[in-house]
UniProtKB/Swiss-Prot annotation:
Keywords: Carboxypeptidase, Disulfide bond, Glycoprotein, Hydrolase, Protease, Repeat, Signal, Vacuole, Zymogen. PROSITE patterns: CARBOXYPEPT_SER_SER. It comes from Schizosaccharomyces pombe (strain 972 / ATCC 24843) (Fission yeast). This is Carboxypeptidase Y. GO terms for molecular function: serine-type carboxypeptidase activity. Glycans are attached at residue 659. InterPro entries: AB_hydrolase_fold, Peptidase_S10, Ser_caboxypep_ser_AS. Residues 51-91, 124-436, 527-546 are annotated as: Disordered. The gene is cpy1. Its EC number is 3.4.16.5. Residues 1-18 form the signal peptide. It catalyses: Release of a C-terminal amino acid with broad specificity.
């Protein structure tokens, strides 16, 4: 099951990657809503047609066409699944065309992946040859990695359809469609009487020489298929007219037999015969031609040689665009290898064949790395030597070498089936994708799968799944019609819309992704819901300039702050009285960071209760991604909490602003009170907005700019904080000049002193391993059966492959697949326990609000009109935004190693880093956090790893255990869940204060 699920992830990421990488034209992307049958019937065709005619169409219907134009298929025949009994999905106009368009990128991509695998990993002998050919194509200069053999199937792989009418043929490049049974090109048989040479000769019999000259277009007879020892072989013709087909040499020779030399000269476009496929020990190999005309096809060398056999040298010179024959695919020990050509190909397109483009042709003839066509003695699909029954069968071979009637393989200069070149649609890919890290996609993450799954059948398998699910295309949109859904109530239904706002804005590709997982018995939304801090958003109220308290209103008494270094960013500060809410008596500021007029980040600043002129400044960030930092304000470390019964603020004596000024920032866009038409769905981009905000904030409030500055956060802030800190440190090396309120400011320098990450996700490759351990070996006892824990741990092998693929390639579709698989396999089983995933000691009390009723109370409080008026906010409050969460996932942001590497970078720069974790949390548990800090590569890794965990007793009572070396520290806190300040407010405040003053591990 795991193998099949992983295969689905890979297959679907290929389709998604085709969209991301531009393999599908923009007009094929379609609309943005997937419609189930009940939704479709609810609105009806008239509504959809109206939306189609509007400026923002809901769908893009297929135009009607006449019956004569509709594709005809014999009764009982189905294009994608011969076993599928219902024609409903295939009767829709344009279904085949649309499905083909949807699948074609996957086909192209998978064939490219297969070719890449064969190209990158070759035998040691071929590696040695490549090292001696430094001027070969750029593709050979790419980094090499040795892995197990990859058995990508070539074009003559028979697959499971090799017998009977079900056998598939490759489509002609000028047609995107796939050949089905009734339209597959027919093979032409070749009868023995058509041959002009005898099929066999007795020993000593003299072979007649071929004609010395042939008229244009005349077909050359093939030589005998077998010769007895000592028999004399006739020489080939001395001259051929343009376009004349050259006969192939004998397929087998006995020891000592003399091989005839090839022709001395060929006309442009003439097809050169291939050399013998096998030679006996001591047999002399004929040399290749000394000269070839432009565009002439060079014959490949023999596929196998016996020990000691002498290899003929390649031609000394080739014309521009001429195709060079590949060297032998296999050599015996001590065998002499022919030298490479002394002059390399010019990048020109030659006459006749359209598929041989020289060194850049990566689809068919790839030189020494080409395993799709010439694979030597191990190639069981194409050239098998004298025992090859599939390719060279002697005089009775009717499938491949058919003499003058063979139209499938040797067509000469007019061959369009085998030599396609620049018109091949499979080659029309962005150049930057041809020589990038994409070639490592399957190698690192899916190598074992590719070895066991025939590449030729992947697209067909994908079609079968679509048929099974009832996926149809309505216009350019895959529509799931639930008409044929199973009636068994024990089977969970597929995704439905109804009032589920979490799925309402999924793109068609994302929806198809989730449907596939659901069909395999996986509920991906469980992982999203539990790991992303989602809460159903309230209906957003658009900004209204009629509100007198709106920040942007003309009557506002606030201030706009601009900086020369950030022309697209503006800070709007509300000069109001948020302290009127009774949250705290200290000075407070609220406002927005505006980004290009369509993104607005909300902030709330609280001055220190102690000494605001000298106390440090702390930026607090909650995670998610997509969860508001105001959750931290009112539930964890802010000046007040919200009573769940009265919705009144209650004073918090252990607030982190007791000895520091604190900024609570809602980021990224559409988190909390932040809003905008545009989206930021990756950590790196979010970091640029945060850096701009800090510059603008300290420009507006220079009294805080010189103070020590720290960044703290939890959960997905394990991604945010390392990246944001790195962004600040890089910019601190430069100079920025600002304009604030009309006067010039001095060079801005953000005085970053340290970072703190609580129960964060930073290194998934290490952390995901400990879900099984935490489930059965936590200090609070097992929460699952040992069998379930073993099952989770067993799934880690596949999970680790996927995460490693993301780490090594950074390729978004691989990272997406890793997130989907690992979140469901490793975290999904926890949902059956009914416990709080953020604190395994408790039951989940409020599923809609992160299992905590406190978060629901916060949302209700902040959506009161008088509260919003005091804050000057423009939208209703969203505790957690699932759309942002899913957006980060489908950008591949979850599983990248960038953030772990950022921790290394800031440690090496001397910035102190504290990783702390409550030991009752499951989602980002202390076991995983302790393990990744031990495994982190940095200058002090050994000393940190060897350091012992020591008790931490802030008030004479042990509250945790920790260790440190130089500027890196780790602290485990007892009796605390995911939100440490919520469970241990006093200990967490002491942790912050002692960390800031340097006494935490003293």
């Amino acid at each position: 099951m795991l193998m099949k699920q992983t295969f689905l992830y890979f297959l679907l990421t290929c389709v998604v990657s085709a969209q991301f990488n531009g393999y599908v034209p923009p007009e094929q992307n379609g609309g943005d809503i997937v419609v189930p049958k009940d939704f479709y019937e609810k609105f009806g065709e008239d509504f959809i047609r109206e939306q189609e005619e509007s400026s923002a169409p809901l769908m893009n219907p297929v135009p009607e066409r006449d019956e004569a134009e509709a594709p005809h298929h014999p009764k009982g025949h189905h294009e994608f699944n011969d076993d599928f009994e219902d024609d409903t999905a295939l009767e829709h106009p344009g279904f085949k065309d649309k499905l083909d368009s949807f699948l074609q990128p996957a086909r192209d991509f998978l064939h490219t992946v297969s070719d890449r695998l064969d190209n990158i990993f070759d035998d040691d002998e071929d590696e040695h040859v490549r090292e001696k050919r430094p001027h070969d194509s750029a593709d050979e200069d790419a980094p090499r990695r040795k892995h197990g053999k990859c058995k990508g199937k070539g074009k003559h792989h028979k697959g499971k359809h090799a017998k009977g009418k079900g056998k598939k043929s490759h489509p002609k490049p000028e047609d995107d469609s796939v050949f089905f049974d009734d339209e597959r090109p027919k093979h032409h048989e070749f009868d023995d009487e058509d041959r002009e040479f005898p099929a066999h000769h007795e020993p000593g019999e003299h072979m007649p020489p071929p004609p010395m000259h042939h008229k244009p277009g005349e077909h050359m007879p093939p030589p005998p298929m077998h010769h007895e020892p000592g028999e004399h072989m006739p020489p080939p013709p001395m001259h051929h007219e343009p376009g004349e087909h050259m006969p192939p040499p004998p397929m087998h020779h006995e020891p000592g037999e003399h091989m005839p030399p090839p022709p001395m000269h060929h006309e442009p476009g003439e097809h050169m015969p291939p050399p013998p496929m096998h030679h006996e020990p001591g047999e002399h190999m004929p040399p290749p031609p000394m000269h070839h005309e432009p565009g002439e096809h060079m014959p490949p060398p023999p596929m196998h040689h016996e020990p000691g056999e002498h290899m003929p040298p390649p031609p000394m010179h080739h014309e521009p665009g001429e195709h060079m024959p590949p060297p032998p695919m296999h050599h015996e020990p001590g065998e002499h290898m022919p030298p490479p050509p002394f002059k390399h190909h010019e990048l020109e397109e030659h006459e006749g064949p359209e598929h041989h483009r020289g060194p850049e042709d990566k689809e068919h003839h790839k030189g020494p790395k080409d395993k799709e066509h010439h694979k030597g003695p191990k190639d069981k699909e194409h050239h098998k030597g004298p025992k090859d029954k599939e390719h060279h069968k002697g005089p009775k071979d009717k499938e491949h070498h058919k003499g003058p009637k063979d139209k499938e393989h040797h067509k000469g200069p007019k061959d369009k089936e085998h030599h396609q070149g620049p018109k091949e649609k499979h080659n029309e890919r962005p150049e930057q994708n041809m020589q990038s890290s994409h070639e490592l996609l399957v190698i690192e993450a899916f190598a074992d799968l590719i070895n066991s799954v025939p590449v030729e059948e992947i697209a067909e398998e994908f079609s079968r799944f679509l048929d099974t699910l009832g996926i149809e295309y309505y216009g350019n949109i895959p529509v799931h019609i639930q008409e044929n859904a199973p009636k068994d109530s024990s089977i969970p239904p597929l995704f439905e819309f109804d009032d589920d706002l979490e799925l309402s804005d999924l793109t068609p590709e994302q929806f198809a992704y989730l449907e596939m997982l659901k069909a395999e018995g996986i509920d991906p939304m469980t992982a999203f819901r539990d790991q992303s801090h989602p809460a159903k958003p309230s209906n957003a109220q658009p900004a209204d300039s009629s509100r007198p308290y709106a920040v942007f209103s003309q009557e506002e008494n606030g201030e706009h702050v601009n900086l020369k270094a950030f022309p697209d960013h503006t800070l709007r500060v509300k000069d109001s009285k948020p302290e009127s809410l009774g949250i705290d008596t200290v000075k407070q500021y609220t406002g927005y960071l505006d980004v290009e007029d369509d993104r607005h980040l909300f902030f709330w600043f609280f001055e220190s209760r102690n000494d605001p002129e000298n106390d440090p400044v702390v930026l607090w960030l909650n995670g998610g991604p997509g969860c508001s930092s105001l959750t931290g304000l009112f539930m964890e470390l802010g000046p007040s909490s919200i009573n769940i019964e009265t919705l009144k603020p209650e004073y918090n004596p252990h607030s982190w602003n007791s000895n520091a000024s604190v900024i609570f920032l809602d980021q990224p866009i559409n988190t909390g009170f932040s809003n905008g038409d545009d989206s930021v769905l990756d950590t790196v981009t979010a970091g640029k907005d945060v850096y701009a905000f800090l510059n603008l904030f300290f420009a507006k409030f220079p009294q805080y700019a010189h103070l020590d500055f720290h960044i703290a956060g939890e959960s997905y802030a394990g991604h945010y904080i390392p990246q944001f800190a790195k962004e600040i440190m890089e910019h601190n090396q430069g100079a920025n000049f600002f304009v604030a309120s009309g006067y010039e400011m001095e060079k801005q320098y953000i005085n970053l002193k340290s970072v703190l990450i609580g129960n964060g996700l930073t290194d998934p490759l290490v952390q995901y391993y400990f879900y099984g351990k935490m489930a059965c070996e936590s200090p609070y006892g097992p929460i699952m059966s040992q069998e379930e824990c073993d099952r989770i741990t067993g799934a880690y092998d596949t999970c680790a492959k996927l995460i490693t693929g993301c780490y090594q390639t950074g390729f978004t579709p691989v990272c997406i697949g890793a997130s989907l698989y690992c979140n469901n396999a490793m975290i999904g089983p926890f949902t059956k326990t009914g416990l709080n995933i953020y604190d395994i000691r408790e039951e989940c009390r409020d599923q809609e609000h992160l299992c905590y009723p406190e978060t629901g109370a916060i949302e209700s409080y902040l959506n009161q009109e008088f509260v919003q008026e005091a804050l000057g906010v423009e939208y209703d409050y969203k505790g957690c935004n699932t759309e942002v969460n899913i957006g980060f996932l489908f950008k591949g942001d979850w599983m990248r190693k960038t953030f772990r590497d950022d921790v290394t970078a800031i440690l090496e720069a001397g910035l102190p880093v504290l990783i702390y974790a409550g030991d009752a949390d499951y989602i980002c548990n202390y076991m995983g956090n302790e393990a990744w800090t031990d495994a982190l590569e940095w200058a002090g890794q050994r000393e940190f790893y060897e350091a012992e965990l020591k008790p931490w007793s802030p008030n004479g009572k042990e509250a945790g255990r920790g260790k440190s070396f130089k500027n890196f520290g780790y602290l485990r806190l007892y009796e605390a869940g995911h939100m440490v300040p919520f469970n241990q407010p006093e200990a967490s405040l002491e942790m912050l204060n002692s960390w800031i003053d340097g006494s935490l591990f003293a």
